[in-house]
Design a protein with these regions (language model features):
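C-terminal tail/sorting-segment detector
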Residues: 353-357, 363, 372-398
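Short, solvent-exposed loop/turn segments at conserved positions within beta-propeller repeat blades
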Residues: 58-59, 99-100, 146-157, 196-197
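Glycine-centered coil/turn sites that cap beta-strands in beta-rich domains
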Residues: 301-315, 319-340, 349-352, 361-364
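A short helix->beta-strand "capping" segment at the edge of beta-propeller domains
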Residues: 23-39, 215
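Loop/turn-rich, solvent-exposed surfaces of beta-rich toroidal or solenoidal domains
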Residues: 199-200, 204-206, 212-215, 219-251
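Short loop/turn segments that connect beta-strands within beta-propeller blades
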Residues: 67-71, 108-112, 163-167, 206-210, ...
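A short loop-to-beta-strand structural motif that recurs across blades of beta-propeller domains
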Residues: 62-64, 103-105, 158-161, 200-202, ...
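Beta-rich, blade/repeat-based domains predominating
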Residues: 31, 37-52, 79-103, 121-141, ...
C-alpha cells in the first residue's frame, strides 16, 4: 500500500479568497492511501452493503471488487457495458451507468442485467455518466456524450433525468454543456450537479413533485482539469473532484479545504462500516482517506431494512479458523459484540463501536485477546445493540 502525505493547500492563496480551515474534516497529518492500482481508467466507487468496495474500469468493461480484509482485488461483474457511475437501488441491487450500452442498468444478486432507462421519447440516451438514488427510490442521473461520438447522438442535448419507481423517465434539465457529477444534500432538498468542462457546480431546489427549480451557481473552480464525481456528508459539506484533487465546500459555498491526490480524480464515495472513509478513483488507481466526517445518504436500501438489528449466522460454520459474522442495522446504533466459551467466559471482544444503518461484517480468527489460537469447541457470538441482545452458536473445529 503506497502512502502519500496530503498537501493541505490553502486555496485562498491561490484564488485570493479566505479559507475557513477550522471547519475542515481532514485530520491534521492525514495520509491518502493507494489501495489498488494498475487499471486502465477507474470510476464510480461504491461501498457494497456486504462490506467491500466496487468500482468501474471503463475501458476494461469490468467492475472490480476490493476486499478491505485482504487488500485483494477481483472481478465483481464483467462485461459491465463500459460502466461508469455505480449506485444501489432500494433492494440493494447495483445500478450501473453504462457508456457502451448507453443506458442505466440493474445488476441483480445472481449477476444478471436488466435495463432501467435507455431511451427518452423513442431516442437513445447519450451515455449515462453518474447517478444518485433518492430514499424514495427515484433514480437521478446525468447523460453527457462522453461515451459516444457526435454522429451517434440522437437527443441533441445533454440532460439531467429522473427515473421513477413506476418506470417513468422524466427530463429535469438540459441547460448544462456536460452534466456529470450528481448528488443530494443530506436532507435531499437540494440537488447538486456539476458542468464538467466548465468546472462549475450548480444547485437546484428539489420540489414536492420531484422536479428541480431555482438553478443557482454554487461554485466555479479554477485550474486545469475538469469537475467530476461529488458527494456530501451529514453536515452538508460538499466534496467534488476538481483540479488537483478533492475540493471540500461548506453548505454556504465556501472552500474549506482540498485533498491533494497524485492522479486526476474521477469520482469519490463513502465507505467502511462507519462511512468515515472517503474512497477516491483517480486515473489508474483507487485511493482512500479517513476523515472527521460521516457520509450522507449512504444507501437508499436502508429504509427497507428490518427494524432494530439482525444478527446472521456466522459463515462458514463449522469453521477453521476464520469465520465472518454479519449484522444488519436499520438505524445508527451502538454495538458491543464479543465471543464467549461454553463456560460463559468472554474470550474475545469483536467490537465496541457506533455503526450507521446498513449491512456490516466482522471477522474472527478463533484467537483470544492475546492472539493465542483457542481450542476446538462450541463458542457463542453475543451482540448487544442498545436494548436488544442476539446470540449465535459457532462451532470451531481445528
Amino acid at each position: 500500500m503506497f502512502k502519500y502525505f496530503l498537501q493541505f493547500i490553502a486555496l485562498g492563496l491561490l484564488i485570493g479568497a479566505p479559507v475557513i480551515m477550522a471547519q475542515s474534516p481532514v485530520p491534521a497529518g492525514a495520509v491518502v492511501d493507494k489501495i489498488a492500482a494498475g487499471f486502465q481508467f477507474v470510476e464510480g466507487p461504491l461501498w457494497h452493503p456486504d462490506g467491500f468496495l466496487i468500482f468501474s474500469d471503463i475501458p476494461a468493461s469490468t467492475v472490480y471488487k476490493w476486499d478491505p480484509a485482504t487488500g485483494n482485488t477481483s472481478v465483481f461483474h464483467k462485461p459491465s457495458g463500459n460502466s461508469n457511475g455505480l449506485s444501489l437501488d432500494l433492494q440493494g441491487n447495483v445500478l450501473l451507468c453504462q457508456h457502451g450500452k448507453r443506458r442505466v442498468a440493474r445488476r441483480s444478486s445472481d449477476g444478471s442485467e436488466s435495463a432501467v432507462a435507455e431511451t427518452y421519447q423513442g431516442k437513445k440516451l447519450n451515455s449515462p455518466n453518474d447517478l444518485t438514488v433518492k430514499k424514495d427510490g427515484n433514480i437521478f442521473f446525468t447523460d453527457p456524450p462522453y461515451g459516444i461520438n457526435s454522429s451517434q447522438e440522437e437527443l441533441k442535448f445533454y440532460g439531467i433525468f429522473r427515473y421513477s419507481p413506476a418506470g417513468e423517465l422524466v427530463l429535469l434539465d438540459k441547460s448544462l454543456n456536460r452534466p456529470n457529477g450528481i448528488c443530494f444534500s443530506p436532507d435531499e432538498s437540494k440537488l447538486y450537479v456539476n458542468d464538467s468542462q466548465a468546472l462549475k457546480i450548480y444547485v437546484w431546489d428539489v420540489q414536492a413533485d420531484l422536479s428541480i427549480a431555482n438553478k443557482t451557481l454554487f461554485y466555479s473552480m479554477t485550474g486545469g482539469g475538469a469537475a467530476d464525481g461529488m458527494k456530501t456528508d451529514t453536515e452538508g459539506r460538499l466534496y467534488s473532484s476538481g483540479p488537483g484533487g478533492v475540493w471540500i465546500f461548506s453548505p454556504d459555498k465556501k472552500v474549506i479545504d482540498k485533498i491533494a491526490v497524485p492522479e486526476t480524480v474521477t469520482n469519490l464515495n463513502w465507505g467502511d462500516t462507519d462511512y468515515q472513509t472517503l474512497f477516491i478513483t483517480a486515473g489508474v488507481s483507487v485511493y482512500s482517506i479517513r476523515l472527521n466526517a460521516v457520509g450522507a445518504a449512504v444507501s437508499a436500501e436502508t429504509d427497507l431494512m428490518p427494524q432494530g438489528f439482525e444478527l446472521a449466522q456466522n459463515y462458514p460454520n463449522p469453521f477453521n479458523p476464520n469465520t465472518t459474522i454479519a449484522f444488519t442495522l436499520s438505524q445508527a446504533t451502538d454495538i458491543f459484540a464479543a465471543v464467549y466459551n461454553e463456560r460463559g467466559q468472554q474470550v474475545y471482544e469483536l467490537t465496541r463501536h457506533r455503526y450507521l444503518p446498513g449491512r456490516h461484517q466482522l471477522a474472527w480468527t478463533a484467537r483470544d485477546e492475546q492472539g493465542k489460537l483457542l481450542p476446538s469447541g462450541v463458542y457463542f457470538c453475543r451482540f448487544e445493540a442498545e436494548e436488544q441482545v442476539q446470540v449465535r452458536k459457532m462451532i470451531y473445529i481445528r
